[in-house]
C-alpha cells in the first residue's frame, strides 16, 4: 500500500483538510466512512487496521461489529464491509463468482456491475470444458480485481489435528469440505 501515493491521488481529486482538523473534506463535506464487520476470527482486528490506515489518510472511519453483516449487506447500508468467504464451497468456481460478482449476485453487497464480467459468467454457466472453465474463472477474477471494487486483505490459516489412523483427510486453502469418499479410519 502506497500511503503517499494515496494521499496524492486524494488531493488531485479535490480532497483537502480545509479547516485543519485532520479530516479531509471535499466541497465542504467531511469524508467519513462506516465499516461493518462481525466477530469471525481476524475480522474485527482487520477492520481496526483498515480504520487506522484510513485515519492516516485523513479519512474518518467508524467500525461497527454486528452479529452478521448479511442484512446490512443486502440493504446496502454501509460504506465498507470486512467479511470472510469460503470461496469454493462446491469445488466449482461458478457459484462463488456469480453470487459475488454477477450484477444480480445474491452476495454482491457492493453492487458491483460489469457487463464484461456478466458475459463471461453467462459463458461459464454453460461451458463444460474444464480447461475453458478454469480460464474463464481466472479472467473474471482478473477483471474484478482490475476494477478495484474488492480488496482481499488476508487468508486465514486453518490447522487440522487427527489421529494417525485417519487416512485421506485433505486440507484445502479454498474449501471447507475436508472429508471425502477417500477419507477413512484404519
Would you name each region that the model predicts?
Residues 7, 51, 55, 94, ...:
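Generic hydrophobic alpha-helical scaffold/packing signal
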Residues 30-39, 61-64, 79:
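Short, well-ordered beta-strand elements
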Residues 1-8, 18-31, 74-77, 96-126, ...:
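Short, solvent-exposed loop/beta-turn-alpha elements that line the ligand-binding surface or hinge
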Residues 3-7, 13, 37-50:
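Bilobed "Venus flytrap"/periplasmic-binding protein-like clamshell domains
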Residues 52-101:
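Periplasmic binding protein-like
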Residues 13-37, 84, 128-163:
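Bilobed periplasmic-binding protein-like "clamshell/Venus-flytrap" ligand-binding domains
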Amino acid at each position: 500500500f502506497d500511503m503517499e501515493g494515496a494521499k496524492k491521488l486524494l488531493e488531485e481529486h479535490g480532497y483537502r483538510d480545509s479547516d485543519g482538523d485532520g479530516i479531509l473534506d471535499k466541497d465542504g463535506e467531511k469524508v467519513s466512512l462506516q465499516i461493518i464487520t462481525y466477530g469471525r476470527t481476524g475480522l474485527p482486528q482487520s477492520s481496526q487496521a483498515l480504520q487506522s490506515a484510513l485515519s492516516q489518510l485523513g479519512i474518518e472511519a467508524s467500525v461497527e461489529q454486528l452479529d452478521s453483516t448479511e442484512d446490512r449487506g443486502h440493504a446496502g447500508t454501509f460504506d465498507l464491509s470486512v467479511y470472510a468467504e469460503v470461496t469454493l464451497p462446491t469445488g466449482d468456481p461458478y457459484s462463488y463468482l456469480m453470487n459475488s460478482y454477477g450484477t444480480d449476485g445474491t452476495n454482491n453487497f457492493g453492487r458491483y456491475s460489469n457487463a464484461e464480467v456478466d458475459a463471461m459468467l453467462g459463458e461459464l454457466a454453460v461451458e463444460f470444458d474444464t480447461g475453458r472453465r478454469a480460464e474463464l474463472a481466472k479472467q473474471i477474477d482478473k477483471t474484478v480485481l482490475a476494477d478495484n471494487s474488492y480488496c482481499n486483505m488476508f487468508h486465514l490459516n486453518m490447522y487440522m489435528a487427527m489421529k494417525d489412523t485417519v487416512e485421506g483427510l485433505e486440507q484445502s486453502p479454498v474449501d471447507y469440505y475436508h472429508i471425502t469418499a477417500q477419507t477413512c479410519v484404519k
